[in-house]
Amino acid sequence: MNHKYLYLLLLFLIVSCQRNVETGPPVLKEMCQRLFPRHAQSFLFELLTDSIDTDRFILESSQGKIRIKGNNRNSLAAGLNHYLKNYCHTHVSWYASETVEMPDVLPEIPQPVYIRSKCDNRFFLNYCTFGYTMPYWKWQDWERLIDWMALNGVTMPLAITGQESIWYKVWTDMGLSDEQVRSYFTCLLYTSDAADDTPC
C-alpha cells in the first residue's frame, strides 16, 4: 500500500472523528445511506447551537421520523447508535461485509432521550491493530471503521502514520547510516511490532 495513500486515509480518519469540526448533517445522511439505505430518509439530524460544550445528544420521534440533535457530528452519530442499539436492537459491526439488520418499521421513541458524554476524549485502537488485517484493507473496510468509530463516539483514533519518518530522522541525527536505519524498517504488517520491539 502506498504510504502517501495511508497517510491521507488516516488524516481523513482523524478529521472525521474530531468533535469540534462542524460541516453539518449531510455526512450523517450519507452514513445512514451506507448502513441501512431503506431507512436512511427516516432520520433527521440537527446540530444544537447553544453554548454548552459537553458532547451530548437528544433523541425524539417527530412526525413519523427519528430526530437526533447533537452538539457536533460525533454526538449525532453516537445518538444514532444509541437509537439503533436500544430501540432497533441491532448492531453495527466494524466489518464492512456485515449488513445492519433493521426492523421493518422503525420503533418510535415514547419520550425524548437526553444523554451527555461521560468523558471529553474517547480513544480507540492500539499499535497492534495496525498489524493484523489493516494493511490489506480496501476503502470499504476503512469507511466502515470510520462509521463505526463515529457511531461509538470515538474522538481520538490512534494514527501511527509517519512514525517511520520520525524514527529515520532521529536515528540518522544520532549517527546511524541510511542503510542501518532502513534495514530496521519492515512491511506494514509488522510495523506495530517494530514500534515496541515485542510481538503483539
Question: Where is each model-derived feature located?
Answer:
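Sec-dependent N-terminal signal peptides
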Residues: 5-14
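Feature activates predominantly on carbohydrate-active enzymes
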Residues: 26-31, 37-39, 48-52, 62-192
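Exposed beta-strand-loop-beta-strand "reactive/processing" segments of non-cytosolic proteins
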Residues: 55-59
